[in-house]
């Protein structure tokens, strides 16, 4: 199929096929990232959270050095706790450490254990792949998703490339979830929540983390369908805090 035409002038199914093909082919199939005419070391423009700034960042301050040392000590404490998860999983100490912010180095593992991702994956072998393929049949949803994906965390180094790896994973998860939970389908708030999960989790793990947050026994009251669909600013702040209080406050 010719890829150079405008996909939005094609019938719905044609639009969906072209969008999916662009993501599958990766960044080279899409628009180039504008980094200027000269090659630059992007690390000089990227902060510790992965946000790419327009200007080169100043050298690390004494305060930042102190904060990093503190983060390292907290990471060691978390590593010991994660290694003995059965002992700590339902304790007050765990809750306190979560609200103090989970260190970035162990955040993915902590989220995985908190959301019981390994268990839900083992109970649903191959389910994510099936849902991903099923979701790709809905061109209307794919069109909505790709518009939001292109504007999600677009200044973060993992999502800065149009049709890059992380944008592809984000699109795939949202497409799969729309098929997995048709009652919710797709809502634009899901794009940012899922992208934050992808910062610390592999693709399939991020999918199951999303399902646990939206429908798991422990979290379903926070992420009911009624809360998500209105998309109000207040309910979005509540959902973001429940989902990502560690990363949003780091």
From Swiss-Prot:
InterPro entries linked to this entry: Rab-GAP-TBC_dom, Rab-GAP_TBC_sf, Rab_GAP_TBC_domain
GO molecular function terms attached to this record: GTPase activator activity
UniProt xrefs under Pfam families: RabGAP-TBC
Cytoplasm listed as a keyword: no
Keywords linked to the UniProt accession: GTPase activation
Residues covered by the Rab-GAP TBC domain: 101-250
PANTHER family: RAB GTPASE-ACTIVATING PROTEIN 1-LIKE (PTHR47219), RAB-GAP TBC DOMAIN-CONTAINING PROTEIN (PTHR47219:SF25)
Function: May act as a GTPase-activating protein for Rab family protein(s).
Name this polypeptide is given: TBC1 domain family member 26
Species of the source: Homo sapiens (Human)
Gene that this polypeptide is encoded by: TBC1D26
């Amino acid at each position: 199929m010719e890829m150079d035409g405008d996909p939005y002038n094609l019938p719905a199914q044609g639009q969906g096929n072209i969008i999916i093909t662009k993501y599958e082919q990766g960044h080279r199939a899409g628009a180039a990232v504008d980094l200027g005419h000269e090659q630059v070391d992007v690390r000089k423009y990227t902060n510790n959270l992965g946000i790419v700034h327009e200007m080169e960042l100043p050298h690390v301050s004494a305060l930042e050095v102190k904060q990093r040392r503190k983060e390292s000590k907290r990471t060691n404490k978390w590593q010991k706790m994660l290694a003995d998860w059965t002992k700590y999983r339902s304790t007050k100490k765990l809750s306190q450490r979560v609200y103090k912010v989970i260190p970035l180095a162990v955040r993915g593992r902590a989220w995985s254990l908190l959301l019981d991702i390994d268990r839900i994956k083992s109970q649903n072998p191959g389910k994510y792949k099936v849902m991903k393929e099923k979701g790709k049949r809905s061109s209307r949803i794919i069109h909505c998703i790709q518009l939001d994906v292109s504007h999600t965390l677009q200044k973060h180094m993992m999502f800065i490339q149009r049709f890059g790896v992380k944008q592809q994973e984000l699109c795939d998860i949202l497409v799969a979830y729309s098929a997995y939970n048709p009652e919710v389908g797709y809502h634009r708030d899901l794009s940012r929540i899922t992208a934050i999960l992808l910062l610390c989790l592999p693709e399939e793990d991020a999918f199951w983390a999303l399902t646990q947050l939206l429908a798991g026994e422990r979290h379903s009251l926070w992420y009911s369908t009624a809360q998500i669909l209105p998309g109000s600013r207040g309910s979005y702040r509540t959902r973001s805090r429940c989902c990502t209080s560690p990363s949003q406050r780091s």
